[in-house]
Swiss-Prot record:
Sequence ranges assigned to domain Sigma-54 factor interaction in this UniProt record: 206-428
Domain PAS: 78-120
Species assigned in the record: Citrobacter braakii
KW Lipid metabolism (keyword) present: no
Protein's cellular compartments: Cytoplasm
Predominant subcellular localization, coarse grouping: cytoplasm
Functional note: Dual transcriptional regulator of the TyrR regulon, which includes a number of genes coding for proteins involved in the biosynthesis or transport of the three aromatic amino acids, phenylalanine, tyrosine and tryptophan. These three aromatic amino acids act as effectors which bind to the TyrR protein to form an active regulatory protein. Acts by binding specifically to TyrR boxes in the promoter region of the target genes.
The protein's name in its UniProt record: HTH-type transcriptional regulatory protein TyrR
Gene field: tyrR
Annotated ACT domain residues: 2-72
Length: 514
């Protein structure tokens, strides 16, 4: 039987309660005092008459405002809540004392190690989990959690061990043990895959920190709601396919199919049947399958003149004929095209139909190269590090202090895809818990070899010149990391270089990174 006594803060009140229980020969099993004015009593069951009499006498004690029965003592309630939480967790969880002996194990851990709760308490963590010195870690008086890759029964787990501190009598935090959680890398990978699959809400996958990329995303949001053909241009690896899919998801056609065809990856004779279908085989083409939705034609600059003519006809009235059939089919499809080529130059050289270019160029989205978006490089790096570490089931490495300087000054000729591949390669070969510049393979990059695309030629002559000048300074500053060395390399005064670096924010960027 448990009672909750509401009372005032009066000296001697608790003693009077205890004296009353002694007087009635009641066996007290436990007492807990809450600082906010509540006393909890736990004693054996009483007959109704004795219980009613006891309640009346407790209420007559000076300072007692009320008394009532409760199902649990506060400590019992907390213990039951914790037990329910641990039982509900799908991940194995262990509680360790300062000798790394197991004090508590949830059902998931009992199942993993094939032991009962009692048998688990007879083991230390090291007897069940190899590859980590638990005792040495506890003796080091850790303040933060630590992650470690471990193998248990042939399964890969990410082990996270967290120190448990309690406040001692002198108000200092004392280490009393640790909590170990084991997360299956297979389960984590599936969860990440499901999350990635579900988190396709339009532009949520696109990193946009710089003002220029924010403007591009905002422009894309507006263009996404329209039905006219959309032309997306940009260098290789800038994310044209990602923007195309985002535009579909942000459009009224989001619930309808989205299909993509790379015009450079399949032979010319196969492109026609892929897009328009093949009647003798009963095959539906992309346009028919995506009726009501969107179709991305990637690398549109690689499309043959004959297919350009057929595409132009389809764009004009939305009708086409399947290969081997005279019957016309009408569909409602938004066509999104992407290219890294300069279509204007191709038109001038007779390699691309002028009328098709103007039909596609109604709505245009130009994606800038990553070298023009230095503010986006580290957020992209952090995103890919987190993503690939989680997928591989390894702890996320810390990024070294000098990594930002190197990555933001590199030219990234392959743009976002280049960053993604470089980070993936680095993580698969990383030894240790810190990602450093030497861990990332960055081939020599010559800014002078970069092709001048349409996006580079935007704006006035001063804007184009400034953009190119900033790119040159950014690249050379990597190899000549002082204003005097850079000035000597370029044959100008130290003051002139200092002013230019300040103008483009390169000197401030270096200071902030240092």
């Amino acid at each position: 039987m448990r009672l909750e006594v509401f009372c005032e803060d009066r000296l001697g009140l608790t003693r009077e309660l205890l004296d009353l229980l002694v007087l009635r020969s009641i066996d007290l099993r436990g007492i807990e005092i809450d600082p906010i004015g509540r006393i909890y009593l736990n004693f054996a069951e009483l007959e109704f008459t004795n219980f009613s009499s006891l309640m009346a006498e407790i209420r007559r004690i000076s300072g007692v405002t009320d008394v009532r029965t409760v199902p649990w003592m506060p400590s019992e309630r907390e213990h039951l809540a914790l037990s329910a939480l641990l039982e509900a967790l799908p991940e194995p969880v262990l509680s360790l004392d300062m000798k790394s002996k197991i004090e508590m194990a949830n059902p998931a851990s009992c199942q993993l190690f094939a032991h009962t709760q009692d048998r688990m308490r007879n083991h230390t963590a090291a007897q069940l989990i190899n590859g980590f010195n638990f005792q040495r870690w506890l003796e080091s008086n850790p303040q933060d959690s630590h992650s470690e890759h471990v193998v248990i029964n042939g399964q890969n787990f990410l082990m996270e061990i967290t120190p448990v501190h309690l406040q001692g009598e002198n108000q200092e935090q004392m280490l009393t043990g640790a909590v170990v959680m084991l997360r299956s890398t297979i389960r984590m990978g599936r969860q990440l895959q499901n999350m990635t699959t579900q988190d396709l809400s339009a532009f949520s996958q696109i990193i946009a920190v710089s003002a220029k990329m924010k403007h591009v995303v905002e422009q894309a949001r507006k263009l996404a709601t329209l039905s006219a053909p959309l032309l997306i241009t940009g260098n290789t690896g800038t994310g044209k396919d990602l923007f195309a899919h985002a535009c579909h998801l942000a459009s009224p056609r989001a619930s309808k199919p989205y299909l993509a065809l790379n015009c450079a990856s399949i032979p010319e004779d196969a492109v026609e049947s892929e897009l328009f279908g093949h009647a003798p085989e009963g095959k539906k083409g992309f346009f028919e399958q995506a009726n009501g939705g969107s179709v991305l034609l990637d690398e549109i600059g690689e499309m043959s003149p004959r297919m350009q003519t057929k595409l132009l006809r389809f764009l004009n009235d939305g009708t086409f004929r399947r290969v081997g059939e005279d019957h016309e089919v009408h569909v409602d499809v938004r066509v999104i095209c992407a290219t890294q080529k300069n279509l204007v130059e191709m038109v001038q050289k007779g390699l691309f139909r002028e009328d098709l270019y103007y039909r596609l160029n109604v709505l245009t989205l130009n994606l800038p190269p990553l070298r023009d978006l230095p503010a986006d490089i580290m957020p992209l790096t952090e995103l890919f590090v987190a993503r690939f570490a989680d997928e591989q089931g390894v702890p996320r490495p810390k990024l070294s202090a000098d990594l930002s300087t190197v990555l933001t000054r590199y030219g990234w000729p392959g743009n976002v895809r280049h960053v993604k591949n470089a980070i993936y390669r680095a993580l698969t070969q990383l030894e240790g818990y810190e990602l450093r510049p030497q861990d990332i393979l960055l081939p020599d990059y010559d800014a002078a070899t970069v092709a001048v695309g349409e996006e580079v030629m935007e704006g006035s002559l001063d804007e184009i010149t400034s953009r190119f000048e900033r790119s040159v300074l950014t690249q050379l500053y990597m190899n000549y990391p002082s204003t005097r060395k850079l000035a000597k390399r370029l044959g100008v005064s130290h003051t002139a270089i200092a002013n230019k670096l300040r103008e483009y924010g390169l000197s401030q960027q270096k200071k902030s990174e240092e």
